[in-house]
Amino acid sequence: MGFFNFFSSQKETPKQPQSSEAQLQSDMFANLSQTQKFAMVTMLASLAAAPANAERTAMAQKMMFTDAAMMGITQDMMLNYMLTRTKPNAQMVISTLGTITDTEVLEWLIYCGYSIIVVNQNEKACSVFFDWWHKLGYEPEEIDRVVKETEAICNKMRQIINL
C-alpha cells in the first residue's frame, strides 16, 4: 500500500485532532533505523538549505519536526555542523535511503522533498532532488505521479476537515 493509499484509508472524521499528522509520521517511521531517519532528514535539510526565508523554513520544519525522533536527529545534525562544519556525504545518504523498502515512507519523502523545492524555487536544489531520486530508481514521471496523487488526498483531507 502506497503513501497516498495509506492516507486515503484513514478514517474520515469531520474534525481531525492536531496530533494526527505527528502520529501518522511516528507510525510510518517506527520501523526505520536511526541511520535511515538521519538520511531522510539530511535529504530534506539539503533541499531546504538555499538562502532562508520564512516560508521555506516553515515548510522544512513541518516536514522534519512533527516526529520527535526526527527532531532529535535534526538537532544533533545541526549541532554537529556548527561544531565541525562537516556535512554528511551525499553518496552515503543515497545508499542509506536505498535501504528503505517501505513504499509509504519513500512516497512521503518524495512528496516532502518536492514540496520543499517548489517553495524553494532553486534550480540547484531541484536538480539535486531529481538526481537523488533517479539514483534511487525513480523516474520524473513516477515522482510526478506520487506528488499528484498525494496532493489529491491532501486536498480531500482539507475538505473533510473544513466541513
Where are these regions (language model features)?
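Small-residue-enriched hydrophobic alpha-helices in membranes
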Residues: 2-48, 55-163
